[in-house]
Structure formats: structure tokens, C-alpha cells
């Protein structure tokens, strides 16, 4: 379990990666408390002075011009939570909800939302008790924030809705009891502060980022294995080639291949003086393609780290100036575009892997037995595994279509341009699963090809990667039930063990 002292606005990508993968024991930095309390005092003054301020004593959306009577303010905040909990579909995973909640706490605790410390502490207590609200995956367009998902999260604070604890679904009231809490009555501004924000979209996008990083590492390892299995040249990874083009991420990708292939390879030495002049693009252009993918991963990581530490509420409370300002920080366009770029990277990583695997089973190109099996004809070998890879790669081409270019007006045209960030980010998990499946097939194929090169061995790191697989899946000597082999390789890739074989500090959240 991760023990995390939250300094609002300063959470790292590596910490968020850990939050997304395992339970967390969260503590709020005491230095954040004065700012939180000062922002609530500004809201209290608005009520005391009978001023009209959006979100505090008005309606919402197109109803923003409707003034709410003082005796209805508590009802207003409860009503917005219950009415906006209108999501649909399967529930988010506990991991996604936990990440979303930590992001929400991080944002609220910065002291610009006018929400009491008591409410923030309730969210912290739920996270620490591993009580995760049941939040439907669908129902947000990423502006005005992720209203429906965050409303479902917030219903539990009222003793409403549902939550999961240890895999069991319980009522919101029971969920509070498990965490040692009682239902709360929200004060003015608090319901809106809980609901406004990009935390659902950002949680999905961060998960997509971490998946993309793991896939990048596995694809680089599998790609290096395929170079060796196909008796490919190391010369395309020469740093001089990439230095004259100048793209930092391409130079780093080439360095990663050199790191894996090393110079001490019996397989590499066995064909130093061969007649082959150039390898096909799927081998030779790996640094250029994977470098471009790495650049998209890094660009997206930069955007998402900022967003993870941002205040995306509306209106915002500036206690120093005794001012409350309405704006549009809830609009998740940066998240949507970051997610779209991650989608491109995930799709291309898979597309290139499928082409490498297709090369390996083609004996004319790889000089390996047809379909990577002896006694071809009787045995079909890896023939249909490549078809599976092709199917997954083609699915990702459709899923990679940018979501951020879409928009559909909501709230009677008051909210007339939206980001579609939630879908842009949510589909990344499915795309990642597809690409992991493609890589699983390449992993099996490359290991098979390397075994055909025996007794010659590859570099130390590539032999380690091959041995990881061989401990789970044996050499394919004749046709057998293939699906379990793919599943074993897939499960191994999901553990992200290949990250340890990569150069340090290559990927933004991996340390």
C-alpha cells in the first residue's frame, strides 16, 4: 500500500501510477488547511451579505439567472448531486474511481473551491477505507466537467447511491458506516464544487498513459527480439543516423534498442557479413516510428500532469482578493487532445508489432520455417495467430479516430461546445488491451524465432525477456491449442516486467 502525504498541486505522475495500481493511505499536508478554510470564509461572506453569485445562490446551467432563496440553499446543493447522478453503463473499476477521487481531493484541497475541510476529509476517509463509489462509465461529455461521474461519486457522501468495498456492492449509507462516517449536509457551493471538474476524464487518460508507457516498453523489447530472430541489422540504430535528424524521442528510442541488443550477441555476430543490404521498414524504421510514439506519450504526460494538479472547478474562489469568478476551467479539451494523441501512439505501436510478426512467419523474409513451425502442412503453426493480430490492429485503427473534434451542445445551448474527453480517454483501455494482444503474439513469435537460431544466443537482456516467456510457455514444436499460449503471454505483458529491461528515465511515470 502506498502511503502518500498529499501536497495539493504537487502530485507526481509516478505517484499517480501507484495510486492507479494499488490502494493508498492518504494524508493531507497540514499546510493546505488555511487556504481551504479561507476559501469557505469567502463563501460565507457572500451568504451573509446577500450577494448573488453563480453556484452559491443561483441555479445551474441555463438556470443560472434563477436566484435561490436562503432557506433553499442546502436543498440546492443536495439536489444538484442527486439530479446530476444520471450516468449509465458498467461501473468504473475500483482503480479508476480511486484515482478519480485522489485527483478530486488534490484539486479541492488547493483552496480555490469554497468547500469545507470536513468534506475533503470525508473523501480521504473513503479512499483510505477502500470504499469506492459505484460510478457508471458513460454519461459525461467532458464539459461542464465530468458532472455525472462526479455526482455518482458524491452521492455516497449524502448516504445515497452505492459503493464497493472488498468487491461487494453496498448502499451509500452502509459505505459511510464502513468508513466510520455519517451522511453530510452540503453547504452552499459544495455540491457544485464536487461535481465540476475534469477528474473522471483525467483518471481515464492517466490510466491510458500508464498503459501506453508499458506497451511502449514491451513493444521495444519484442521489437528487439524480432530483429534478432529475423537476423536483422543493428546499423539502423546507430546514433549518428538519428542525431542528424534531431528528434530527441527518436534518438532516445534508438538508444533503447541499442541498450537491449547490446554488442555481445552470438546471433548478431553470426550474420555480420551476410548479403542482405537493408531490412524491411518494420525492423529498420523502429526508432522513427517508436520515437514518434514516445513523443506523443511524453507530450500527453506533460499535459496530464498539469491537469492532475489543476483546479478545474467553477466558479473559483480567490480568497486573497475576496473574489469569486466564473470561468471555464471545467472544459476538458486539453485532456481530450492528450487522449487522442495517446490513442494514435497505442494504435501505431500495435500496427508496427503486427507487421514485425507477419515478417517473422514469412520464411522468404525471415529465413525461418514457414509460420514458425517444423513440418509445415501437417502443422499450421502461427498462421492464424497473425490473423488475430491483424484483427486487433484494424480495430484500433477505428478506435483511434479523434474524439476531440466532436462536439454536441447540451443544457439548452448554454453549454454549446464540449470536449468529449471522457470517451477520448475511456477507449484507451480497450485500445491498450488490443495492442497488448498483438504484442503477446509477437512475443511468442519472436521467442520461437530465437529458439530456431539455437545454439546461438542473443544479448543478455533479450535472453532474459525470452526466458520470462519460456517459464510460462514452452517451444511450439507441433500444433497445439494456441489460445492459452497467447493468454499466458498477455498476462506476462500486463505485469509490465519489461519496464525493468529498459533504460532509466525513458518514460515519464516509470522510475
Curated annotation (Swiss-Prot):
Query: Which InterPro entries does the record match to this protein?
Result: Aromatic_Lyase, Fumarase/histidase_N, HutH, L-Aspartase-like, Phe/His_NH3-lyase_AS
Any idea which UniProt keywords this protein has? Cytoplasm, Histidine metabolism, Lyase
For the cross-link 5-imidazolinone (Ala-Gly), what are the residue positions? 143-145
The EC number(s) attached to this protein equal: 4.3.1.3
Query: What does the entry's PTM section describe?
Result: Contains an active site 4-methylidene-imidazol-5-one (MIO), which is formed autocatalytically by cyclization and dehydration of residues Ala-Ser-Gly.
Which species is this record about?
A: Vibrio parahaemolyticus serotype O3:K6 (strain RIMD 2210633)
> What residue ranges carry the coiled-coil annotation?
none
- Give the taxonomic lineage as stored in the record: Bacteria, Pseudomonadati, Pseudomonadota, Gammaproteobacteria, Vibrionales
Q: Which GO terms describe its molecular function?
A: histidine ammonia-lyase activity
Record family assignment: Belongs to the PAL/histidase family.
Q: Which domain of life is it from?
A: Bacteria
Listed disulfide bonds for this chain?
none
Q: What gene, per UniProt, encodes this protein?
A: hutH
Give one Pfam family, short name only.
Answer: Lyase_aromatic
The 2,3-didehydroalanine (Ser) modification is found at 144
SUPFAM superfamilies for the chain: L-aspartase-like
Pathway of this protein? Amino-acid degradation; L-histidine degradation into L-glutamate; N-formimidoyl-L-glutamate from L-histidine: step 1/3
Main localisation, per the record?
A: cytoplasm
Q: Which GO terms describe its cellular component?
A: cytoplasm
Catalytic activity as recorded in UniProt: L-histidine = trans-urocanate + NH4(+)
Identify this protein by name.
Histidine ammonia-lyase
Query: Where found, per UniProt?
Result: Cytoplasm
Query: GO:BP terms for this protein?
Result: L-histidine catabolic process to glutamate and formamide; L-histidine catabolic process to glutamate and formate
